[in-house]
Amino acid sequence: MYMAIMIILFLSSILLSLLLLLRKHLSHFSYPNLPPGNTGLPLIGESFSFLSAGRQGHPEKFITDRVRRFSSSSSCVFKTHLFGSPTAVVTGASGNKFLFTNENKLVVSWWPDSVNKIFPSSMQTSSKEEARKLRMLLSQFMKPEALRRYVGVMDEIAQRHFETEWANQDQVIVFPLTKKFTFSIACRSFLSMEDPARVRQLEEQFNTVAVGIFSIPIDLPGTRFNRAIKASRLLRKEVSAIVRQRKEELKAGKALEEHDILSHMLMNIGETKDEDLADKIIGLLIGGHDTASIVCTFVVNYLAEFPHVYQRVLQEQKEILKEKKEKEGLRWEDIEKMRYSWNVACEVMRIVPPLSGTFREAIDHFSFKGFYIPKGWKLYWSATATHMNPDYFPEPERFEPNRFEGSGPKPYTYVPFGGGPRMCPGKEYARLEILIFMHNLVNRFKWEKVFPNENKIVVDPLPIPDKGLPIRIFPQS
């Protein structure tokens, strides 16, 4: 009898919890005049559909299917439920403009719980003032005049990378190599770290963290999220030690403010816990190499698919080489001449945006396109929604770098770096390392895809070729 009562109480508590969850879930969508759409299951919402679309090789499908069902050219907004939050997805140039121009007025940046649990203090700083100061510091460090001194360093790293990782190889898998290249540059630029063994050790932990950042936040042994949390603790310990050492070097006058971004931050950000600063550096390292490595990978892919584009890039880079003495490295003036090469990289980012989109949080109630968006709701904007829209880019499936000649795309249609106050501060940094990669690549090699008809892209959480892009390489004559 006692056991039966306990079982009934246990089952009743579970049922009550489920009913409360359902009530909370439904309460999010009880407001009048909300955008049309589906909310999915309680708590889970449509998160699995959102993630699985990318993992199945059709990252755009989640957005396009719902735009077709729920939106029109005039509304361009639908509701869903992602990562535990009611969410309005805005699409189109007008949606991008609305979010980017209302940053810190109606919306603020927001990250899923998985990000905040892995990086408690890096992605969301403790105050708006701290966030503003950090962005200002990054902008100062990443502006063109400040980056000039890194051209030679990046070029040297690129030459060494292609000599040790690509030369004398018949076949390579591109994506792991581009990650290695951009991570080496990030370690050198942000931490002045050059020891290959130490860089390799950090890279392994970073890769584990990057895979788990946008996973379902279930902290059970063996899950991506669990592995990412463990790896982030090891990274935090390692980078905190570097921070402490650099503080001592700055006190002793053994390091300069312009030495790297860590010194720059220590000299300007004020008193900060080593662990908090380590989280910020880790976040920057991930942002500073993951997205650029994706662009470099797909540059290799599209240059293999379109020989006439490869030839124009090669011609442009050969012209730069002709003006240089033997073994003379690249300079900032050379980067400025790589106009067609950058058009190619821009077209790559249009078709395969390295970041599909990001979230915002409504900090007040407001109306968009005639629909009510409650305070506390999350908003998601998608780069693909405009990049692959024929109204903005005719024949969007066609690879055409000349789209970026002259004045280029219309405002708010091409957004690989976001926009508004939250636009990626590392845009010029990314341009620099991508162009230096292209320069060294085409001047040394020709290549062909091992699987010429394999174009599947998996977004997990960032877009990568399904097989990592294996290619056969040949020395440039």
From Swiss-Prot:
It comes from Arabidopsis thaliana. It is found in: Membrane. GO terms for cellular component: membrane. InterPro entries: Cyt_P450 (IPR001128), Cyt_P450_CS (IPR017972), Cyt_P450_E_grp-I (IPR002401), Cyt_P450_sf (IPR036396). Keywords: Heme, Iron, Membrane, Metal-binding, Monooxygenase, Oxidoreductase, Transmembrane, Transmembrane helix. Possesses triterpene oxidizing activity. Catalyzes the C28 hydroxylation of alpha-amyrin, beta-amyrin, and lupeol, producing uvaol, erythrodiol, and betulin, respectively. Catalyzes the C28 carboxylation of alpha- and beta-amyrin. This is Cytochrome P450 716A1. Gene3D superfamilies: Cytochrome P450. Its main location: membrane. The keyword DNA repair does not apply. GO terms for biological process: triterpenoid metabolic process. One of its GO terms (molecular function) is oxidoreductase activity, acting on paired donors, with incorporation or reduction of molecular oxygen, NAD(P)H as one donor, and incorporation of one atom of oxygen. CDD domains: CYP90-like. The chain crosses the membrane at residues 2-22. Its cofactor is heme. It is a single-pass membrane protein. Belongs to the cytochrome P450 family. It is an enzyme of class 1 (oxidoreductase).
